Structures are given as structure tokens and as C-alpha cells.
A protein has these predicted regions:
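Bacterial N-terminal signal peptides that target proteins for export
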Residues: 1-10
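Intrinsic low-complexity, intrinsically disordered segments enriched in polar/basic residues
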Residues: 2, 16, 283-284
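Intrinsic low-complexity/disordered segments
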Residues: 4, 19-21, 278
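Bacterial N-terminal signal peptides
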Residues: 9-17
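Structured extracytoplasmic
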Residues: 23-164, 172-177, 182-201, 206-211, ...
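Beta-strand elements of repeat-based all-beta scaffolds
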Residues: 206, 217-219
Length: 297
């Protein structure tokens, strides 16, 4: 996944079978959350169309994404504040549908990142000291600090285990709602020759429930200062926002996803109105419209 992974299906009966969060220690809470997240990930075969706004140092995109088990079809509405005409949108999709190498690369990166995320999830209980910092009727907030006796098995784990931060858990479904963290010291590889991530490098992720037992990533914020690339599909500086989730058939093909993302009535581009009114203002870029609460693409 291009960190579009998080097509995680929580099995409702499994979640309900666990005891309440507040009867557990913080370490037990996080172990339970990890078990539920990993189980959901293994059982999730759902596909979704969603609206994505992505910011990287040299690129700003607004696009509809139709995810499948063989990759994701992207309908780019706006690139670097310039709206793409519909014929150009179709051309780019058509090019992707005929580019087997690009499809395989996308799937390879997604599989790599999924494995890495699963490995890091498994480390959460042992890699950190957890303390409860607050709770509501629906969520529990935890703070994490590095466990002094933990020995990270990989380079990625070493970076992960050097972070401190906070995590919010959904009390009923035992899912991660939010997690954020930052490095509290520089992390170097090979004495700095092979890479370095600087203190205060940070990340933040948010998930939202998009169906009765379906959760998806809704925000990704990565700000890593340095030159050690961890995830193949995530930039060292990246901010993604995802919304307007709509389900697709579980067995949808790339070709079918392309039709859905172009023809779905609710997926209208943020371009010009059908008939321009004399003296009217030009349409706002998609990025601005997404920020408006009443925006319906």
C-alpha cells in the first residue's frame, strides 16, 4: 500500500469479547489493541474510493483514489494548484491501466509497507513504557516512552523505539484512533555515514471508522529530518488527508475501479460549472473546496 494499507476489518465479535479497557493496565490495553489491529488487517479484503489531498515538498495533489487488491487507480483533479481537464485525467488513468510495471511496483511497495507496519505494531507493547493520561466514555489516551531494556531487531525498529508520543484508543472496538510521536534524540546509522534522522522528527496518523467494522487512515503526517528512508511509498516530508470514503466491491478490478472513479455521480471534479455566469468568480481550486465543510464533490 502506499500507506493506503489500513484497509483493516475489525471482527465485531472479536472486539466485543474482550474485557473493558479500564479493567486493564496500560500495557495490557496496548497489547489488546495490537492484537485487534493485526487480526483486522489480516482479514480485511475491502476496497474503498476516497478523496485525497497530498502535500510533498515538490508536489501538491488533489485526487480521487479507487483502491483494489491489484493497486490503486488515481484520478488527479488538481496538481500544484492547477486543475487537470477531464481528458487529461482519463489519459493518465488509461496510461496506468496499460503499465504493468507501474502496477507491480505499486503492489510491491504496498506489500513491503504492510509487512513493515505489522512488524512495528508487534513492537508496541515491548518497545515502550505506557501510561494512561486520560479517558472519555469512548476513548482512552495513552502516553509512550522508550523502554530502556528493549533491543530493536531492525533499523526501522531502532528509529521507532527512539520515539516518545501519545496514542488514543477506541474503547469499544479497541482500534487506534490517533497516534503521534517524535524522536527525542538523533538516530544515526553507520556513524552517520549510512543515514541520520534528527531529533524532533515526527509523525502523526489518524484512523476513522468508515463502516460498521471498517477503519481507514484519514490523516498521515510525516516530518522526518534526515536521510534514512523507512517506507518505500512515504516521503520524508508528507501530509495526506483522506475523506469521502465510499465502498467498492471486494473483487473490483483495476478496469472496473477506473470506470467507478470516473463515472460515479458523486465524484464530480472540482472544475468549472456547466454554464459559466457572466461576471462570476472563477471556481476555487479543489484544495480550497476540501477545506469547506459544505463541499460535496
Amino acid at each position: 500500500m502506499t500507506l493506503r494499507r489500513t484497509h483493516l476489518v475489525a471482527v465485531g465479535l472479536l472486539a466485543l469479547s474482550f474485557p473493558g479497557l479500564h479493567a486493564q493496565s496500560p500495557q495490557q490495553i496496548i497489547q489488546q489493541v495490537v492484537d485487534v489491529e493485526r487480526k483486522a488487517d489480516q482479514n480485511d479484503h475491502s476496497n474503498w474510493i476516497f478523496l485525497e489531498e497530498s502535500d510533498k515538498p515538490k508536489e501538491h495533489l488533489v485526487q480521487w483514489v479507487a483502491a483494489t487488491q491489484r493497486g490503486s487507480v488515481e484520478r488527479i483533479l488538481e496538481k500544484d494548484d492547477q486543475q487537470l481537464p477531464e481528458p487529461r485525467q482519463r489519459d493518465l488513468i488509461e496510461k496506468f491501466l496499460h503499465d504493468t510495471r507501474a502496477q507491480n511496483k505499486q503492489v510491491e511497495e504496498a506489500n513491503h509497507d504492510n509487512r513493515q507496519i505489522d512488524d512495528l505494531l508487534k513492537l508496541l507493547p515491548a518497545a515502550f513504557i505506557w501510561t494512561e493520561t486520560g479517558s472519555t466514555a469512548t476513548t482512552t489516551s495513552l502516553h509512550f516512552d522508550p523502554a530502556p531494556n528493549f533491543h530493536p531487531p531492525t533499523r526501522e525498529a531502532r528509529v521507532f523505539a527512539s520515539m516518545t508520543g501519545d496514542l488514543v484508543v477506541d474503547n469499544q472496538q479497541h482500534r487506534i484512533c490517533k497516534i503521534k510521536g517524535h524522536l527525542f534524540h538523533d538516530v544515526t546509522f553507520g556513524g552517520g555515514l549510512l543515514g541520520r534522522l534528527k531529533e524532533k522528527s515526527s509523525f502523526a496518523l489518524e484512523q476513522q471508522q468508515v463502516g460498521p467494522s471498517y477503519w481507514e487512515l484519514s490523516q498521515i503526517h510525516v516530518h522526518l529530518e534526515g536521510n534514512a528512508l523507512l517506507f518505500k511509498s512515504v516521503s520524508l516530508q508528507q501530509d495526506d488527508k483522506r475523506s469521502k470514503f465510499q465502498p467498492e466491491p471486494g473483487d473490483v478490478t483495476l478496469e472496473q475501479a477506473a470506470i467507478l472513479v470516473m463515472n460515479e455521480p458523486n465524484l464530480l471534479a472540482c472544475g468549472e460549472p456547466v454554464a459559466a455566469v457572466a461576471g462570476s468568480q472563477p471556481p476555487a481550486p479543489c484544495g480550497e473546496k476540501i477545506k469547506r465543510a459544505d463541499f460535496k464533490p
